């Protein structure tokens, strides 16, 4: 009877990976999933919280454009850095998996999808960004700016940013599904 109770706490060796091995493998794979999810959440919070609040509480075009410009300035430095770091972490996880003979391609795809937000910005958001920069330049020279134009541009930028946030989120979902061994290719 005592032996049976002991076996409850010490399961027999089934030939599977030990908890120590599983933990170290999962740790390498979970870190980029966490950073990708963090990046997507930070970006999505702009669309869901920040942009609506500044649109609801700002009545002067120059102030709205200045607030957007500060958001852009911080994001254009931090976002790509986190995206690239996350892509490198996914690449490292893919490399580690390939060394073990495990399915590594989902992590390579996660890396590519996460970093794809950068060229997406250059290609699809350049027009709205440039229009906003021109509007900001007008207000910096003492002009008031046009409320409807400023509001429309900031709304458009927020929507494009929400789409862009789906890149690191997609990478994180694929990375998580691969970590849990639900997806493999």
Swiss-Prot record:
Places the protein is found: Membrane
Principal location: membrane
GO molecular function, one term: monooxygenase activity
Entry superkingdom: Eukaryota
Keyword Acyltransferase among UniProt keywords: no
CC per GO annotation: membrane
Pathway annotation from the record: Mycotoxin biosynthesis
EC number, UniProt record: 1.-.-.-
Transmembrane spans: 35-55, 75-95, 106-126, 165-185
Annotated function: Monooxygenase; part of the fragmented gene cluster that mediates the biosynthesis of dothistromin (DOTH), a polyketide toxin very similar in structure to the aflatoxin precursor, versicolorin B. The first step of the pathway is the conversion of acetate to norsolorinic acid (NOR) and requires the fatty acid synthase subunits hexA and hexB, as well as the polyketide synthase pksA. PksA combines a hexanoyl starter unit and 7 malonyl-CoA extender units to synthesize the precursor NOR.
This protein's name: Monooxygenase hypC
Native organism: Dothistroma septosporum (strain NZE10 / CBS 128990)
Lineage start: Eukaryota, Fungi, Dikarya, Ascomycota, Pezizomycotina
